């Protein structure tokens, strides 16, 4: 479970560089919610 969050965080850091903080936050929410549903 922790590995998933580390992967999401790592992807998020890359997104932040591309889209800035605002786009990054939206991406994180979109990524984390489906993970919670699977677990």
Curated annotation (Swiss-Prot):
It comes from the Viruses. Belongs to the asfivirus C84L family. This is Uncharacterized protein C84L.
